[in-house]
UniProtKB/Swiss-Prot annotation:
Region (Required for sulfate transport in E.coli) location: 1-436
Key words, A-Z: Cell membrane, Membrane, Sulfate transport, Transmembrane, Transmembrane helix, Transport
UniProt cross-references to Pfam families, sorted A to Z: STAS (PF01740), Sulfate_transp (PF00916)
Regulation: induction: A possible member of the dormancy regulon. Induced in response to reduced oxygen tension (hypoxia). It is hoped that this regulon will give insight into the latent, or dormant phase of infection.
Gene Ontology BP terms: sulfate assimilation; transmembrane transport
Membrane topology, as annotated: Multi-pass membrane protein
TM annotation in the entry: 29-49, 51-71, 79-99, 105-125, 138-158, 184-204, 207-227, 256-276, 333-353, 355-375, 394-414
Gene Ontology molecular-function annotations: guanyl nucleotide binding
Full protein name: Probable sulfate transporter Rv1739c
Species whose genome carries this gene: Mycobacterium tuberculosis (strain ATCC 25618 / H37Rv)
Length: 560
């Protein structure tokens, strides 16, 4: 059995190498070779999405592969350039750099450093719970919005036209006005690459489709001299490895990048943890969210110091490694070795990659992000879930990638507050043949105890729902068909309380007392009891009206 890695200090990845089993080697080697073949063209493509030279994608890949293998808690996750962070990088930096390519590169590296520092500090502060900030509907809608923005950003690349604008609607409008100037050789090449990628995915899912498609396009361009006919190629790529260094940036630029870096950090971390948990669950492993924060932080710092840009997890590369048999992060180290070999000895081949082929690769990746089956699933489950997903997509398209991320987080929080502010509640009764007390709405045959209302409010009590709780509890009393003598609050769901909620509880007790109704509480856990004591409510309610179980509360009512 593979041991879980829930806690291994700052380097949980070391455990997998310390306990490495020889039978895993074949799968890890195959996964490393496959992921490297996938990563090289993908990293170059995402660098262009970020607004940087293709080589920057390779630079941003090297150090994170090694660092995550040691510091990450997932044995499957692949770290490197990815679509969402690349798009956000472009959205943040394009207005700041104003066409200055050198300044753009410096800002990109600085952004990576800031994202890394924020994640590292958050991990040290044990803020791993932030991984739950995005609900499923918001995540589905957000990824669909990101996909559409990715496609719009590549319209010029795959058609050979000049597309202006930095946002979805401006790019689509610009493309629509220049569609008659499509460079057909470029467009045909891009569509051919896209078709080949689609066929490989369907008929040979384990094959490294991106490198096969891009190499095929490169051979076609070289054999037919298509670059002389207007098909753009990557051009010269510096051979060798990047020299680490701190980007020379001003204090003003640092201030301007802090908030965008926080947004990218949230996306990077939440995407990584969600992906890592999904794949870890398949093998009965655990993922330490705080370790993931620290690992992703260190990876981004390293990417910034090696002239890269913010990096994140890749679900596609992770899935590929898992499918071909990768069992540990040794596959990432093997992929790293191949990337280094290519950069040192085969930069001339990379220079011949057609830009249109890289653009087609981005479009292909974007199309895979749009999960129509999930939209249908949301629609079947609850209409409000579907509307939340569509609203998130609209926010990304209308507000841009960065503010769309903030809107996505805000929508998740608002959805959470909506549920907390107006949760399910119930009046409990006895059901013949079933032990305990149950919701009378679920069991029409349930029998209530005359004169007794047993009420349950299914959420922690806090400022967001304090007034809702008080109002609905009184409504239950008002709607009772008989003369209410006792009101018992079943507090099993109300362990967490704040002072606002306890004030509302006291107001409810006071109003019931004014009506001649006894207020009591059942299933009161020790934490709640201590909170009641701290708020001076325990004495007001009375120890004789605080019960450990519902049966003892009902028995006390009957003995009154």
């Amino acid at each position: 059995m593979i041991p879980t890695m829930t806690s291994a200090g700052w380097a949980p990845g070391v455990v997998q190498f310390r306990e490495y089993q020889r039978r895993w080697l074949r799968g890890d080697v195959l996964a490393g070779l496959t992921v490297a073949a996938y990563l090289i063209p993908q990293a170059m493509a995402y660098a262009t999405v970020a607004g940087l030279p293709p080589a920057a994608g390779l630079w941003a890949s090297i150090a994170p592969l090694a660092i995550y293998a040691l510091l990450g808690s997932s044995r499957q996750l692949s770290i490197g350039p990815e679509s969402a962070t690349a798009l956000m990088t472009a959205a943040v930096l394009a207005p700041m750099a104003a066409g200055d390519l050198r300044r753009y590169a410096v800002l990109a590296a600085t952004l990576g450093l800031l994202v890394g520092l924020i994640c590292l500090l958050a991990g040290t502060a044990r803020l791993g719970f932030l991984a739950s900030l995005r609900s499923r509907p918001v995540l589905v809608g957000y990824m669909a919005g990101i996909a559409l923005v990715m496609i719009s950003s590549q319209l010029g690349t795959i058609t050979g036209t000049s597309v202006e604008g930095n946002e979805f609607f401006s790019e689509v409008h610009s493309f629509a006005t220049s569609v008659t100037r499509v460079h057909w050789p470029t467009f045909v090449l891009a569509m051919s690459v896209l078709a080949l990628l689609t066929m490989l995915t369907r008929w040979a899912p384990r094959a490294p489709g991106p490198i096969i498609a891009v190499l095929a396009a490169t051979m076609l361009v070289a054999v037919m001299s298509l670059d002389a006919k207007g098909i753009a190629i990557v051009g010269r790529i510096p051979s060798g490895l990047p020299t680490p260094g701190v980007p020379p940036v001003s204090v003003e630029d640092l201030r301007a990048l802090i908030i965008p870096a926080a947004g990218i950090a949230i996306v990077t971390f939440t995407d990584g943890v969600l992906t890592a948990r999904a794949f870890a669950a398949r093998r009965g492993q655990e993922v330490n969210a705080n370790a993931e924060l620290r690992a992703v932080g260190a990876c981004n710092i390293a990417a910034g110091l090696t002239h890269g840009f913010p990096v994140s997890s890749s679900s596609s590369r992770t899935a590929l490694a898992d499918v071909v048999g990768g069992r540990t992060q040794l596959y990432s180290l093997i992929a790293l070795g191949l990337v280094v070999i290519v950069m040192v000895f085969a930069s001339g081949l990379l220079a011949m990659f057609p830009i249109a082929a890289l653009g087609a690769l981005v479009v292909y990746a974007a199309l895979r992000l749009i999960d129509l089956s999930e939209f249908r699933r949301l629609a079947r489950f609850r209409r409000s879930e579907l509307m939340l997903a569509l609203a998130t997509t609209a926010a990304v398209l209308g507000l841009g990638v960065f503010y769309g991320v903030l809107a996505a987080v805000a929508l998740s929080i608002l959805e959470l507050l909506r549920r907390v502010a107006h949760p399910h509640d119930s009046v409990l009764g006895f059901v013949p043949g079933i032990a305990g007390m149950h919701d009378i709405d679920d069991y029409p045959q349930a029998k209530r105890v005359p004169g007794l209302v047993v009420y349950r409010y299914d959420a922690p009590l806090c400022f967001a729902n304090a007034e809702d709780f008080r109002r609905r509890a009184l409504t239950v009393v008002d709607q009772d068909p008989g003369q209410v003598e006792w009101f018992v609050l079943n507090a099993e769901s109300n362990v967490e309380v704040d002072l606002t909620a306890l004030d509302a509880l006291d107001q409810l007790r006071t109003e019931l007392l004014r009506r001649g109704i006894v207020f009591a509480m059942a299933r009161v856990k020790q934490d709640l009891r201590e909170s009641l004591r701290a708020a001076s409510l325990l004495d007001k309610i009375g120890e004789d009206h605080i019960f450990m179980t519902l049966p003892t509360a009902v028995q006390a009512f009957r003995r009154r």
